[in-house]
Structures are given as structure tokens and as C-alpha cells.
């Protein structure tokens, strides 16, 4: 499979194994060791080279599974915006699941076909980052995170995240 095909699979299926592999490939390409530390260092260097502020970001893996990871919603929204505006990053945007159509957004309560985004769910965190077009035709990048979700509360948090994203889809500056 091509890297593009693997990226599509990793995003749609939310494959932690593939994202770890991509981290190792980035490490090798940037002259780092293909280890957790090398991958996370290389990924942060790569993101910073795009002009995105990575200060305060802590990565201990590239799958997003580590509870020690710390990443801001702003950083994720900036990456989503860049993927929509930079042709070199467009494959990342295209690989994201589409609401109501595929992957981790297939059965979310989000307006079908209107959102491309990546989900993130851990024990006490629910997040969604991507792009949508508002009712008045503006393309917007977003990232929303619910942190400190009570045990057993991920489903309810996800419903609130979906409701917030739907408010972006239906937003119109004209009222």
C-alpha cells in the first residue's frame, strides 16, 4: 500500500498502530531514532516547521493513547486550518473521516457530510478536531476538547461535543 492509502486507513479507522508507524517514519526522515522519543521529537519539530507554535505540547507517543500527552485545541485547529489551505497538507484533510459517511464519524450525531474531523477518546477526554463549512459558506477549522470527563461519562461528553460542532455547521453571521 502507498503511504497515502495507509494515511487514509489510519484516519478513517483511527488506527493507533499505523499512527505509531508514521511517527517512526517521520523520525527516520528527520534524522531521529525510530523510538517513542525520536518519533515524538520529530513530529513536534515537523509541526513547528510549519509555523505552528508547539510550546507546552507534550507527546510521549504518536498514537495519542498516552495519558501523559498534552496538546492544545489551538494547535489541532491550526493544523486543521493548514491542511485546508496548504496543498502539500491537503491529503491529511482528505483522509479525515466525514460525518455520517465513514470511520469514527459514521454514527456520530453530526450533520451528515458536513464535517471532516478526527476523533479522540480516552478515559477522561473526548475531543474532535477538523473542518466544516458554516451555513453562510465559510470554511472553519475547529478543535473541541472535553477534559476531566467523569468515569462513564464519555458518551454524554461526545453528545455535547457533537452538539457544539453542529452549532458551527448551522452558524450564519446573518442570523
Regions found by a protein language model. Name each.
Residues 55-175:
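C-terminal soluble interaction/assembly domains
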Residues 1-90:
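A small/polar active-site loop signature that marks catalytic segments
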Amino acid at each position: 500500500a502507498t503511504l497515502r492509502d495507509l494515511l487514509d486507513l489510519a484516519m478513517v479507522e483511527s488506527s493507533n498502530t499505523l499512527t505509531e508507524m508514521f511517527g517512526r517514519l517521520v523520525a527516520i526522515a528527520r534524522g531521529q531514532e525510530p523510538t517513542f522519543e525520536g518519533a515524538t521529537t520529530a513530529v513536534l519539530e515537523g509541526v513547528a516547521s510549519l509555523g505552528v507554535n508547539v510550546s507546552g505540547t507534550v507527546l510521549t507517543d504518536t498514537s495519542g493513547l498516552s495519558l501523559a500527552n498534552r496538546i492544545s485545541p489551538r494547535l489541532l485547529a491550526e493544523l486543521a486550518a493548514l491542511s485546508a489551505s496548504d496543498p502539500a497538507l491537503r491529503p491529511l484533510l482528505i483522509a479525515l473521516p466525514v460525518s455520517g459517511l465513514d470511520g469514527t464519524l459514521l454514527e456520530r450525531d453530526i450533520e451528515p457530510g458536513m464535517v471532516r474531523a478526527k476523533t479522540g477518546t480516552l478515559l477522561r477526554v473526548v475531543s474532535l478536531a477538523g473542518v466544516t463549512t458554516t451555513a453562510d459558506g465559510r470554511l472553519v477549522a475547529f478543535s473541541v476538547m472535553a477534559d476531566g470527563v467523569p468515569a462513564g461519562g464519555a458518551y454524554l461528553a461526545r453528545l455535547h461535543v457533537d452538539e457544539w460542532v453542529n452549532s458551527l455547521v448551522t452558524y450564519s453571521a446573518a442570523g
